[in-house]
Amino acid sequence: MRHCDSFCELIPMKGCEAMLEWMIDQGAGREPADIVLKGGRFLDLITGELVESDIAICEDRIVGTFGTYRGKHEIDVSGRIVVPGFIDTHLHIASSQVTPHEFDRCVLPQGVTTAICDPHEIANVLGAEGIRFFLDSALETVMDIRVQLSSCVPATHMETSGAELLIDDLLPFADHPKVIGLAEFMNFPGVLAKDPECMAKLRAFQGRHIDGHAPLLRGLDLNGYIAAGIRTEHEATNAEEALEKLRKGMYVLVREGSVSKDLKALMPIITERHAQFLALCTDDRNPLDIADQGHLDYLIRTAIAGGVEPLAIYRAASVSAARVFGLFDRGLVAPGQRADLVVVDSLEGCHAEIVLSAGRVVSEALFAARKPVAEVGRNSVKAPRVTASNFRSQSNSGKTRAIGIVPGKIITQNLEFDLKVGPNGVEPDLERDVVKVAVIERHGKNGNIATGFVHGFGLKAGAIASTVSHDSHNICVVGASDEDIATAANRLGEIEGGFVVVRDGKVLAEMPLPIAGLMSTEPYETVREALRKLRHAAEDLGSVLEEPFLQLAFIALPVIPHLKITDRGLVDVDKFEFVGN
């Protein structure tokens, strides 16, 4: 990306009372605009045309297009194309393992000027304090971070979280200027059963935006769920499911994260006809993938390479996304719109060269001027120390359920294996890629430990462990030996949470995440390289997964079918009940 530090430093901020007059004069060409982008073309998302025109900016607004303008500061964008800033409509910033300030530095230069986040992860650990941390951060970031209030903390009664958020805990935040509405309503069984607390939250936010989360929900049950006032869905994993939800009035957020990769499957619905009802999201994407592939820019160029019309995907990335969430001040290159702009090399390449956020040219100087936000959630890992004996199965039967990993998906399979029973109970079968999985309660509530088996990691030795474990973020460990499972779990307690790879009792790689056991205090570049080392260490153990730690993070999520494990035991998500090994 090309940086233009001097522009944002030289433009004076004017008094608000004179703003309207200045915008009118600059838009009408009577006065020089604050900034003019000259020599390029912009993508008109209404007609689909590439328009040769100057773009005039006054303060944080576009004031002129389809004309020639004089500027106090002029930026030559000859040979390039200007598009509206990209909007990520559903993500968990904590899943990037960096703070909101570092997320800002990481993705804004890629063209993401607005991010609509759910602080669900930190809320499950810290409760209202975690939401407050995100709102305070959102007031300081250069990009516009909007917050959806976490609706399901905990996600279900089938796990132990660090906190619980009832409607009375959410209402004090409802009128915060950065709050849009209610985040993904994962407890769709609770909605359909008219659970009193679910009803209280839904009633309180009627008329405001309520995000959905209803994987594989179809037919009349889907109708009932939508009738509760829920507007969007990011869990559609195939075109047929997405089309049903579109036909029933939902907006579909097309997701491509580090684990959940649904873009290819949903490409058939990304058309000019459907684009006004679509948006893009990443849900969970880590800095390593952002560095190696990109963020929403990656989704855009991947979709176009797959045959999607550029107009359709750029509409979904900006104007359609803005309309879905009621952000009518952005999404177009047009007068009166917020000056969130991305200068790209081409529509197909979508490589950001210059980014403007609210009329400011993005630069390191702009990031350096932000006010810091105090850290929260230190020393949050309060798990009991464990030994190998804590993970030994006492079953006398070799017939054992196993969680089946589906690469690139967070949906799992409900499998059964006939495993060998040894002196320490049921044993892993490395030849058939069946190893142990354990979840350890880490909030200091009850010390629960649950064990089971998982198929699909490819481990031949050692263990990998994490405190990033949706949604309650207890310790989750997968390993080929009980001893290494214990070593990895104990190490997480020593480093305040994070990721660990262990073999033969030795730590091969680790990354501390001391902010609530979820986020690093380091710059995103440091996190990126630590993730690279962790991925290589997991590969050395035999892991066959592209993103083993985020895949691990979803094993304990009991709102995504089909078989999961929490600190309380194995969960058959289809029946929403605990099941034996």
Curated annotation (Swiss-Prot):
UniProt cofactor(s): Mn(2+)
Keywords assigned: Hydrolase, Manganese
E.C. number(s) listed in UniProt: 3.5.4.2
Enzyme class (EC, first level): hydrolase
Membrane-spanning intervals of the chain: none
One GO term (biological process): adenine catabolic process
Superkingdom in the source lineage: Bacteria
Record-level Gene Ontology MF annotations: adenine deaminase activity
InterPro entries the UniProt entry points to: Adenine_deam (IPR006679), Adenine_deam_C (IPR026912), Amidohydro-rel (IPR006680), Metal-dep_hydrolase_composite (IPR011059), Metal_Hydrolase (IPR032466)
The reaction(s) this protein catalyses: adenine + H2O + H(+) = hypoxanthine + NH4(+)
Family: Belongs to the metallo-dependent hydrolases superfamily. Adenine deaminase family.
Stored PANTHER family: ADENINE DEAMINASE, N-ACETYLGLUCOSAMINE-6-PHOSPHATE DEACETYLASE
Protein name per UniProt: Adenine deaminase
Organism: Brucella abortus (strain 2308)
Gene name in the database record: ade
